[in-house]
Amino acid sequence: MELQISSAIIILVATFVASLLIKQWRKSESRQNLPPGPPKLPLVGHLHLLWGKLPQHAMADMAKKYGPVTHVQLGEVFSVVLSSREATKEAMKLLDPACADRFESIGTRIMWYDNDDIIFSPYSDHWRQMRKICVSELLSARNVRSFGFIRQDEMSRLLRHLQSSAGETVDMTERIATLTCSIICRAAFGAIINDHEELVELVKDSLSMASGFELADLFPSSKLLNLLCWNKSKLWRMRRRVDTILEAIVDEHKLKKSGEFGGEDIIDVLFRMQKDSQIKVPITTNAIKAFIFDTFSAGTETSSTTTLWVMAELMRNPAVMAKAQAEVRAALKGKTSVDVDDVQELKYMKSVVKETMRMHPPIPLIPRSCREECEVNGYKIPNKARIMINVWSMGRNPLYWEKPETFWPERFDQVSRDFMGSDFEFIPFGAGRRICPGLNFGLANVEVPLAQLLYHFDWKLAEGMKPSDMDMSEAEGLTGIRKNNLLLVPTLYKSP
């Protein structure tokens, strides 16, 4: 009996491997003028070259050898990595409609309600409508300013905590995450929900499994792998918990009047738009829940990640820290509150934030997918191909940046570059149709808290640590978060 079972398993595996090899051979016969890439292994393609490395690092190494448009075969998935300003501009501007899709993964499909959101939604009427609502109604510059009292209130809470912990080691990773989460909770829901900490953890776990590197994502034709995907059951458990939390939030908003607790929050706006007769594509409850999860995913993870990288780089570069603090303390002296308009004059601090995002982009590999066959840099890119723009690699390319491995904010004084999507070697928020619609909101949630952290406190590393001892490693996942928590010692600054 055991022999029969073993034989059946061997036959099943052999059949699976043979079918994949035949499929890859047939595909290779029809491929012409495709981007260059490293030699492939049967079945796995180039997956072995990513082993033990972060994908953006491994793909940067490939680009050095094979060029800025590199073919990377991820199992069955034909992928192209773009690592130059010119190729990125071609894909994200000149060919933007053709390259405007997102590739789907098991993680995004389960956690983001069949990709019924904005971040992972395919390019469609639904996506265009939700993005328009987001830009004009939810996260416009006017609305970002209207959330100023929330930022100030939550920042005051953090400052009080740091003041009471002066001279002690503080886990800034935890504190900044709490701050950002609280701001987003109040902007989205009108109040801090009871389950906000659990929701943040669910977001982190979801993003770590949303990068498209699950085996079932890399071999999509295999029903067996899809069935046996060991993370699938975990994802569904997480989805059920997320749905319980979001359903409660939605139900509570249905019962209350819009603005009952002081102003229209993001969910109030979505409910209002849901009833608008001008809406062409119906806004479902699942679409609202997916958008809420988007807000947490993009808002908490990227804003807190950038703030922590800024603080880490300032601790590694004391001269930059001193210059930034001098500017902030001169400009904000005597002010009782700080918000978006106040930080506009902090030119050097803004350069510090830019330099941080150059070296540590919130999304190191921006994912796209082809909606039709197209040509980039003279190479054929097949329909449905996965495209990854290596933002991390371009931010450290000596062709575009002098001393790219040096943290040097002054470089932005010499060359005018911004992250609004027109300088394609520097696109931490993306570019083209899919540029981040929450750019202004996210930036405000970095710059306003940062200015106050630099104004009110002097900072030291935990006892016994030197700047050269700091671990600046990145963690795995869709976002470029720090691998280890940032531990700092605040000392209250007293203005002379």
Swiss-Prot record:
Q: Tell me the compartments it is located in.
A: Endoplasmic reticulum membrane
Q: What class of enzyme is it?
A: oxidoreductase
Q: Keyword Transmembrane on this protein?
A: yes
Q: GO CC: one term?
A: endoplasmic reticulum membrane
Tell me where it mainly resides.
endoplasmic reticulum
SUPFAM superfamilies noted in UniProt: Cytochrome P450 (SSF48264)
Q: In which family does this protein belong, per the annotation? A: Belongs to the cytochrome P450 family.
Q: What does this protein do?
A: Hydroxylates both (+)- and (-)-limonene to (+) and (-)-trans-isopiperitenol.
This chain belongs to the protein called: Cytochrome P450 71D95
Q: Which organism is it from?
A: Mentha spicata (Spearmint)
